[in-house]
């Protein structure tokens, strides 16, 4: 069972996506994160932590199926990248590389099976996301989805 940490639960209970994102980033020892919400068929940036201003403009609107967040939304499953800077899979868009981050995880925010958005977190170093951590991030995303 994935127990959502108190700091994240408190922020979620208050409806504050920015605080919930900051608590999630801190809990996993990450340096950056985003929350995109599904609006009019595209993902719109709703909260971000430590994303450079030029990148915020690039990732403000993300089409479903494009980039890491768009792929997580399209597949409705986690997308992990060990190193954004050296990835050759074709999944990583220039905006993601411009963050300077390496280990990235994006998960869909689902409420009753319906896509509501995508939660993304990233570390400054290369990182293979363990299954248990990925499962907890999915649980956090599900908790945030109805907000």
Residue ranges and their predicted role:
Residues 1-15, 147:
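Signal-transmission linkers at sensory-effector interfaces
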Residues 52-57, 82-103, 123:
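Signal-transducing coupling segments at domain and membrane junctions
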Residues 69, 109-123:
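Sensory-domain boundary capping and coupling elements
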Residues 9-46, 56-58, 66:
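Helix-loop-beta substructure at the N-terminus of cytosolic sensory domains
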Residues 102-110:
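A short, aliphatic-rich beta-strand micro-motif
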Residues 122-140:
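Regulatory loop-to-helix N-cap segments in sensory/regulatory domains
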Residues 38, 42, 46, 54-87:
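Regulatory sensory and allosteric helical modules in signal-transduction proteins
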Residues 74-78, 112, 136-147:
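Signal-transmission/dimerization alpha-helices at domain junctions
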């Amino acid at each position: 069972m994935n127990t959502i940490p108190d700091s994240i639960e408190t922020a979620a209970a208050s409806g504050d996506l920015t605080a919930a994102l900051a608590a999630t980033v801190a809990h996993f020892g990450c340096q950056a994160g985003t929350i995109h919400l599904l609006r009019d068929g595209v993902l719109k940036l709703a909260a971000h932590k430590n994303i450079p201003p030029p990148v915020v403009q690039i990732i403000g609107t993300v089409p479903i199926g494009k980039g890491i967040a768009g792929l997580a939304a399209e597949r409705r499953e986690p997308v992990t990248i060990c190193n954004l800077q050296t990835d050759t899979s074709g999944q990583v868009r220039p905006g993601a590389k411009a963050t300077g981050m390496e280990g990235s995880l994006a998960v869909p925010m689902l409420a009753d099976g319906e896509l509501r958005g995508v939660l993304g977190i990233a570390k400054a170093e290369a990182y293979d996301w363990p299954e248990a951590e990925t499962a907890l991030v999915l649980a956090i995303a599900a908790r945030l989805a109805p907000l």
